[in-house]
Amino acid sequence: MAKTIGLSIPNLDVEPIVQNLRECIESGWVSTGGKFIGDFEEKIAKYVGVKEAVGVQSGTAGLHTALRVLGVEPGDEVLVPTLTFIAAVNPVTYHGATPVFIGCDDTLCIDPNLLEKFLREECTIKDEKTYNKKTNSRIAALAIVHVFGNMANMERIMELAREFNFKVLEDATEALGTYYTEGRYAGKYAGTIGDAGVYSFNANKIITTGGGGMVVSNNQEFLDEIRFLTTQAKTDQLYFIHDEIGYNYRMLNLQAALGTSQIDQLESFISTKIKNYNLYKEAIENIDGLTLLPFNTDIRPNYWFYSVVVDEEKYGMNKDELLKKLVEANIQTRPIWGLIHEQKPYQKHQAYGVEKAVWYHDRVLNIPCSSNLTEEDAKYVIEKLKEFKR
């Protein structure tokens, strides 16, 4: 096969996109104003079941601003996963706060048991605030990442947040479309359970605006402050009065014009991802040494990324060797992210219970999962996975 099978490429229906972009360009509103921004915000809000959403420049911009509005201050600590992309952690540092890394469970999300153990054994409560015994710093928030479209255990997490009095920011940048089907939060979408949620529309996400992100919350005052800060904290729209330091984090009308057509196709994209996941699952179950990681059974995931665990002893090669073979076969794949507590800027930061994260880091590959992946291409990937086994 001469062509390359991409890992997670945009699925772009050209006709409606071009129609929207033409309307956007002809209107002259191509920058940070125009009707498509409001239209896209309304569609996202309706889809995930909140009253309002605020479009921003990127998922990172959304996380940065949300942490500020949630009250994270210099000297505070924010609990974060180590198994994630670094963009989920850097915004903590932007505020002069310190990330504390917590390990994962088999969902690849933060382990609620480890989280509880850390809070009970490594922290103390004083004046209704939780402090890290080791550093005497306030635990201001938890930034929880719903990894690869799976869902962290939000029931446990919200119970702990209430008991230990910290804010919960849901990094749902990978999980737009994932929702609970059972339990206390049945029907609730990733990003809508904590104090705030953030989505990303980067090119490899399940829907894209090229870049861009969205902040959601059920707290109107919070969203008003997000909108205010991301538009340069302009107090007077006519006379350019600014009472605070804000950010140029606004979404472009051009981006939103693309997004309004993409969101209409989201459920169709997820249906394709479910079909391809099941195709992989049936085949990989019969390849000794490979395991396709499951998603939680109490959710409808968006199946954003498919994760294969490579058992070197049984498969005959490790995940790095398999990655190289797949790339040589024109199959784009990637290792899981480098653990953040091991990255140079964060090596001196506290990391708690990260052994399982290390285990998965050493064994996981992501295989092609685009929402326009054909059955033929998926079968080619499967064929090569079988062929490469030693």
Regions found by a protein language model. Give the residues of each.
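Conserved PLP-binding active-site segment in aminotransferase class I/II-type PLP enzymes
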Residues: 1-69, 73, 144, 162, ...
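PLP-dependent aminotransferase class I/II
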Residues: 38-42, 50-51, 113, 125-137, ...
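Structural detector of well-ordered beta-strand residues that form the stable sheet scaffold
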Residues: 54, 79, 100, 168-169, ...
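Buried hydrophobic packing segments
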Residues: 62-67, 88, 213, 259
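PLP-dependent aminotransferase-like
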Residues: 68, 72-147, 151-163, 167-179
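Conserved active-site segment immediately N-terminal to the catalytic lysine
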Residues: 170-207, 238-241, 291
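Active-site PLP attachment segment
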Residues: 192-230
